[in-house]
């Protein structure tokens, strides 16, 4: 009889812990997208830095 309440308490403690990784994955998704945007922005800045030379200023306009 003593095992049943202990089992119920353990079951209640384990149930919320099982859903936590799903919540964390939802929170990670926007972070992955913003990292991708950040990398694209860095690539754009690098290409502009390489392109913008005094001899070739026409590509700096965009």
Curated annotation (Swiss-Prot):
<keyword id="KW-1015">Disulfide bond</keyword>
<keyword id="KW-0964">Secreted</keyword>
<keyword id="KW-0027">Amidation</keyword>
<protein>
    <recommendedName>
        <fullName>Conotoxin Lt5.8</fullName>
    </recommendedName>
</protein>
<dbReference type="InterPro" id="IPR031565">
    <property type="entry name" value="T-conotoxin"/>
</dbReference>
<dbReference type="GO" id="GO:0005576">
    <property type="term" value="C:extracellular region"/>
</dbReference>
<keyword id="KW-0800">Toxin</keyword>
<dbReference type="Pfam" id="PF16981">
    <property type="entry name" value="Chi-conotoxin"/>
</dbReference>
<feature type="modified residue" description="Glutamine amide">
    <location>
        <position position="61"/>
    </location>
</feature>
<feature type="propeptide">
    <location>
        <begin position="20"/>
        <end position="47"/>
    </location>
</feature>
<keyword id="KW-0732">Signal</keyword>
<feature type="signal peptide">
    <location>
        <begin position="1"/>
        <end position="19"/>
    </location>
</feature>
<keyword id="KW-0873">Pyrrolidone carboxylic acid</keyword>
<feature type="modified residue" description="Pyrrolidone carboxylic acid">
    <location>
        <position position="50"/>
    </location>
</feature>
<keyword id="KW-0165">Cleavage on pair of basic residues</keyword>
<dbReference type="GO" id="GO:0090729">
    <property type="term" value="F:toxin activity"/>
</dbReference>
<comment type="similarity">
    <text>Belongs to the conotoxin T superfamily.</text>
</comment>
